[in-house]
Every structure is written in C-alpha cells, then in structure tokens.
UniProtKB/Swiss-Prot annotation:
Pathway: Amino-acid biosynthesis; L-leucine biosynthesis; L-leucine from 3-methyl-2-oxobutanoate: step 2/4
Signal peptide positions on this chain: none
Family named by the database record: Belongs to the LeuD family. LeuD type 1 subfamily.
Job of this protein: Catalyzes the isomerization between 2-isopropylmalate and 3-isopropylmalate, via the formation of 2-isopropylmaleate.
Enzyme superclass (EC): lyase
Catalytic activity: (2R,3S)-3-isopropylmalate = (2S)-2-isopropylmalate
Assembly with partners or alone: Heterodimer of LeuC and LeuD.
Annotated HAMAP family: LeuD_type1
GO cellular component: 3-isopropylmalate dehydratase complex
Name of the molecule in the record: 3-isopropylmalate dehydratase small subunit
GO molecular function: 3-isopropylmalate dehydratase activity
Gene: leuD
E.C. number: 4.2.1.33
Length: 201
C-alpha cells in the first residue's frame, strides 16, 4: 500500500526550464537498478554536478541553493518529463524528496507514471505558473499548500484550482497503486478461484 496523499505543504523550488526531459531528470547511466531507492542522488545529475561522479555540486543550479534544501514541491515550465519513457524519472524525484510537481503541461507517459509512484503532477495555466514563479523567485523559501481533496494550490494569498481525473485522485488519496487496487478485490478473486476445478488452480 502506497502512502496516502491528501494535502501537502512544502518548500517550493522554481526550476525555470521548459521541456525538461527524462534524460535530464535521471541520466541513462544511472538506470541499472531495479529498486525505487537511491535514484535521488542522481536527480538532474548533469545539472546539479560539475563532474560525472556527482562529487562537485554546481553552485549555479537552483537545487543546490541553500534556501531550497529540503524542497518538496518542484515548480517547472511546460512539457515537463518529455523524452524517452522511463519510470525511473518519478522514482528519482520522489527519492530526492519531491511530493508535487507543478507545471503548465506534462508529457503523457511521465504524467501517468507519476501517479503510479505517488508523485502528484499538478497542471495549472501558463498564467498561473508565471504568477507562481514570480512569487517563488521573489520569496525564496516560500511554502505552497497543495490540497488534493479540495483540488487547489494555495500560494501567498491566492488560490489556484486544478483539475484531476477522479480515479487518479481516488488512488492518490487512498494510497492505491496497481497492487493496492488489485487487493481491494482480494475476496472476489479468492471466491472466483475457489469455484474453479482443482486441476485449474
């Protein structure tokens, strides 16, 4: 059972870049592992570090700024998560500590993979995202509240409603991944299997 997502208040980091692809999120050389942990160390590796080994932080990259350490909400531009399909991208984001990504648009496969991994992708209009960038950049260290139950982002004194598929919202709020969804029908599955002839079990 995955962690339930009802509401989250967290530090916001503004990544002012459009078309951030999955190879930028987690470069291909770090995809060998099949567990979901450990990828956060390599998140945005080519941007966060000056060396391939990830030992020399790039002081010019926003995630390395002291005021954004511990950020759990990523603010980005349009078409976030484009490029090749890799579930490692949301793995890296969640392992780093992100709970929410806010952007005007997402690549379709990344969008779906995010829900499967309890990372909430919030789509807002470009105008709303522009306002949030201005607010976050003028107030380093600001926290936003993302209320999935009410489907609203609260930032400063403004509220930004967002739309989300009802089924995906239900799964996020109840901590249901694909396994959890199946287990909701465990009794029915067991009853069906018990009706089958012994040679089919």
């Amino acid at each position: 059972m995955a962690e339930k997502f009802i509401q989250h208040t967290g530090l916001v980091v503004p990544l002012d870049a459009a078309n951030v692809d999955t190879d930028a999120i987690i470069p291909k050389q770090f995809l060998q592992k099949v567990t979901r942990t450990g990828f956060g160390a390599h998140l945005f590796n080519d941007w966060r570090f000056l060396d391939e080994q990830g030992q020399q932080p790039n002081p010019a990259f926003v995630l390395n700024f002291p005021e954004y350490q511990g950020a759990s909400i990523l603010l980005a531009r349009e078409n976030f998560g484009c490029g090749s399909s890799r579930e490692h991208a949301p793995w890296a984001l969640t392992d780093y500590g992100f709970k929410v990504v806010i952007a005007p648009s997402f690549a379709d496969i990344f969008y779906g993979n995010s829900f499967n991994n309890q990372l909430l992708p919030v789509k807002l209009s470009e105008e709303a995202v522009d306002e949030l960038f201005a607010l976050a950049q003028a107030n380093p260290g600001i926290h936003f509240e993302v209320d999935l139950a009410a489907q609203v982002v609260k930032a400063g004194d403004k509220r930004y409603p967002f739309e989300i598929d009802a089924f995906r919202r239900h799964c996020m709020m109840n901590g249901l991944d694909s396994i959890g969804l199946t287990l909701q029908h465990e009794d029915a599955i067991a009853a069906y299997e018990n009706k089958q002839p012994a040679f089919m079990r």
